């Protein structure tokens, strides 16, 4: 599980604890550096699949990782952030297709993000459905670019931007392993 790199929303919200009103933000320069560092940390793992949330910050992180590791990106709505801030208003599919023409978005509704705030129960259920599904796949060879809320729902942990955790979806009782911490300068 990879938390996307830093965005301007993250930077401002961390400093003020107020929603700065930025919709579907891009990564900052620091966030792009975090994504490149994550790619380096992932290289020895021999990944075969890269899943990303459809939010721009996750796709941009995934694109940097995919370019460095030679992986295709698969978009999944199920690993998106809990919808509760302005940054969780996504981009229309036409914009996503124009920016990432090699990524498939045809399976998503437009708009693909919720219309109302999601409860913690909703994102927890979504994370558990994802956990059950990924158990049937080659999960050791799969990386998922996702968000603070989804990682928290799945693991109970809060992690900084650019952090990589290894989870065993078949063992929800097992603590995730920290592969890389994005919490450095």
Give the role of each language-model region.
Residues 52-53, 125, 145-146:
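Short beta-strand scaffold positions
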